[in-house]
Every structure is written in C-alpha cells, then in structure tokens.
Amino acid sequence: MKKRKFANAAVMLILLSVVGYAFFGSPVEMYRRGELRKAMAAVEDGEVTLNEIVPFAWDSVYSFGPYTTQEQMEEIMGISARRLEESPSEGMVQLVFVNGGQIVCGVCGYISKEGYSVSFDEKINFADNVVFRAKRDADGILWLTEPHD
C-alpha cells in the first residue's frame, strides 16, 4: 500500500513538473531572467557593457524587433528556438542570450515591466565587449543605447 502511494505521488510530481515546464518554461531561464532584471536595476547612468551586467555565461545576444516570428529568429541565430515567442507589440524588449549554441535566457516583455531596454542591431558577441550609454528616465527605466567605440 505504501509503495502504491509513493508511486502515485511520484507520478503526480512528474506530471506537475511537465505541465509547469510547458506553461512557464525552464525554471533556470526564469531564474536567469530575474537575476538579469536585478542586475539591470543596479546599473547607474554612464557607460557600461553587457559583459559587466549580465550575471550568467553567454557568448552572444540577439535583439529582435516587434513581430519577428520564431522562424525568423531561428534563421538569424542558426539554432532551434522552440520556446521563443514573437513580440506582439511595440514597447517591448526582446533579447535572446546564447552560450555554446544553446539558448540560456530569453527575455520578451514590456519595457515598463522589465525595467530596461537595450538597443542594438541584431547581434552582439561577448568578445566584442560593446559599450552602451546607460541612462534612466523619470520612471526609473534603464535605457542602454547606441553602442559606440
């Protein structure tokens, strides 16, 4: 009887995990998004690189504009991106961090909710150590703009 209860509990736990993953995505990615949001919240006005900010390993980051389809993202990145979503409107941040050919963090959310916006053309490599201008607006939103040398 105890074995059956244990087996039922194990099956239920596995099912809940699968359903949770299907609806909410990877808990590791969720954790990384939260850590990235915290790191962005700590950035002060001035010059900064993503290498200094991003709190997890990455070798390239992609930025996609609104309405970019999953298929277009996959073609640009050259990898399968099953969990990526199209940004449904203007005013959203859409970043995909890749490490070793695997997506390690995807951000698709309203700038006002994420608390930051990062503006660059399509792709940045970690090795490039691109410098951004960091500026907070009156609402406390961090704007990382215009990479420059």
Q: Whereabouts are the PLM-identified features?
A:
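A short acidic/small-residue loop/turn micro-motif
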Residues: 108-113
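C-terminal partner/receptor-binding element of secreted or periplasmic proteins
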Residues: 114-149
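N-terminal export/targeting and maturation segments
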Residues: 3-9, 16-84
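Exposed boundary/loop context
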Residues: 10-13, 94
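Short, low-complexity, polar/charged sequence segments that are solvent-exposed and flexible
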Residues: 80-84, 101, 115-116
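Short, structured surface segments that line ligand/substrate-binding pockets
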Residues: 85, 89-107
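Extracytoplasmic
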Residues: 56-58, 89-92, 127
